[in-house]
Regions:
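Hydrophobic pocket-lining residues that define ligand/cofactor binding sites across diverse proteins
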Residues: 12-13, 147
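Canonical Radical SAM [4Fe-4S] cluster-binding loop centered on the CxxxCxxC motif
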Residues: 1-3
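Short, surface-exposed helix/turn micro-motifs that flank interaction/cofactor sites
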Residues: 6-7, 23, 148, 156
Length: 168
């Protein structure tokens, strides 16, 4: 629950902790299970109000869940690092669909453009999966072209490996 997270953050701040890193499998959907709606923007506002916390970093924000409201909070709250770990996994529409992702190349480009327009100094990190079953040389080249065009500041690339319960 949010109150427990806020209490833990307050306790950490009182112990001298300066940075909070919010990380979950899908950080951007925080609150859906408990409150039946996304609560990350509210949580961020409330964490930023805690004295002693200097900066907050967000990890694992899937692009399809990054909302204009979240971007606005990141823009307004000075304690939130202009750094976003946004795992896109691939950029080929065909492979994204096979992976079960809920986005496509155009939506990825639109989201990145929105982030860079609203937060010009944002640092974007992403992770990619290569060798996904059925990936062709054309899919791979498309991904290389996408990465070159976007110019991510940080990039992690991993070979496909089967993981129970997920296609990717």
């Amino acid at each position: 629950p949010m109150e427990r997270l806020l209490k833990e953050a307050q306790d950490l701040a009182e112990q001298g902790v300066k940075e909070l890193i919010l990380v979950a499998q899908e950080t951007t959907v925080y609150g859906i299970d408990l409150y039946k709606k996304k609560m990350l923007p509210e949580l961020l506002h409330r964490l930023c109000a805690i004295p002693g916390i200097v900066w907050i970093r967000l990890l694992y924000c899937y692009p399809e869940e990054i909302t204009p409201e979240l971007v606005q909070v990141m823009k307004e709250e000075k304690k939130i690092c202009h750094y976003l770990d946004m795992p896109i996994q691939h950029s080929s529409d065909r492979i994204l669909k096979k992976m079960g992702r809920r986005t496509n190349r155009k939506e990825l480009l639109d989201k990145i453009e929105m982030l860079r327009t609203e937060i010009p100094d944002i640092v974007l990190r992403t992770t990619l999966i290569t060798g996904f079953p059925g990936e062709t040389q054309e899919d791979f080249e498309e991904m290389l072209s996408f990465v070159d065009m976007v110019g991510f500041e940080r990039l992690g690339v991993f070979p496909y490996s089967p993981e129970e319960g997920t296609p990717a």
